[in-house]
């Protein structure tokens, strides 16, 4: 069998508290102390739920409540306690005399959370927020040049060395190798879209057994 409700809600006032109701609640708690919230409304003569009386006292009427803005010291305590307890506002309020759990929760959501985000701190984990790394696209020819500097030059020079005749005499084979060297040079230029005029000039057969 479940727990019975603390009051008959059909006959309860649900609007704003009046000054007379506040004073009745204050006088009763001063004389009898806090507690027994379920039976309190009937004892005081209030058409209010026991939970409503408790929240009214804790959040608005108790004499030790602090009014006004949170101090820097209180804010630091809230941040530290939140890193330990998370959103357990009642535990945090227990360490801050005069502040209510509802008041602390509202201040966290409207002020502190935004401040932490502006400082690059995750309000949930209290760790640094890591920005995702962005990847940029590089064309294939630029990627080759940056990854293997000088590789294009090495390929050119190797091709030219193969053009040189070991006999020292211009032969049909020399001419064929020279044409082949020019073809590979131009073909590599088109493939990588490189400007070969920067530092290198197109290969031409100039002298006997030489390729420049």
Swiss-Prot record:
Any Pfam family the entry gives: Myb_DNA-binding
Location, primary (coarse class): nucleus
Keywords: Activator, DNA-binding, Nucleus, Repeat, Transcription, Transcription regulation
MF terms in GO: DNA binding
HTH myb-type domain boundaries: 9-61, 62-116
GO CC annotation terms, alphabetical: nucleus
Record-annotated DNA-binding residue ranges: 37-61, 89-112
UniProt key word Nucleus: yes
Protein origin, superkingdom: Eukaryota
PROSITE patterns noted in UniProt: HTH_MYB (PS51294)
KW Transit peptide (keyword) present: no
Localisation per UniProt entry: Nucleus
Function: Transcription activator.
Name assigned to this protein: Transcription factor MYB8
Originating species: Arabidopsis thaliana
């Amino acid at each position: 069998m479940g727990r019975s409700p603390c009051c008959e809600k059909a006959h309860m006032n649900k609007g704003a508290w009046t000054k007379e109701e506040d004073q009745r609640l204050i006088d009763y708690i001063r004389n009898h102390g806090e507690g027994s919230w379920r039976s309190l409304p009937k004892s005081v003569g209030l058409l209010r739920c026991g939970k409503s009386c408790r929240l009214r006292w804790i959040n608005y009427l108790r004499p030790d409540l602090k009014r006004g803005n949170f101090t820097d010291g209180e804010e630091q305590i809230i941040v530290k306690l939140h890193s330990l307890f998370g959103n357990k506002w009642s535990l945090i309020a227990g360490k801050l005399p005069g502040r209510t759990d509802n008041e602390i929760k509202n201040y966290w959501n409207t002020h502190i959370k935004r401040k932490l985000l502006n400082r690059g701190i995750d309000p949930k984990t209290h760790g640094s927020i890591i920005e995702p790394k962005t990847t940029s696209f590089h064309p294939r020819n630029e990627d080759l040049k940056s990854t293997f500097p000088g590789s294009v030059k090495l390929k050119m020079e190797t091709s030219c060395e193969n053009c040189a005749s070991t006999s020292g005499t211009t032969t049909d084979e020399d001419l064929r190798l020279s044409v082949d060297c020019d073809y590979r040079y131009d073909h590599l230029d088109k493939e990588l879209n490189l400007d070969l005029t920067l530092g290198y000039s197109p290969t031409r057969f100039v002298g006997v057994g030489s390729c420049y």
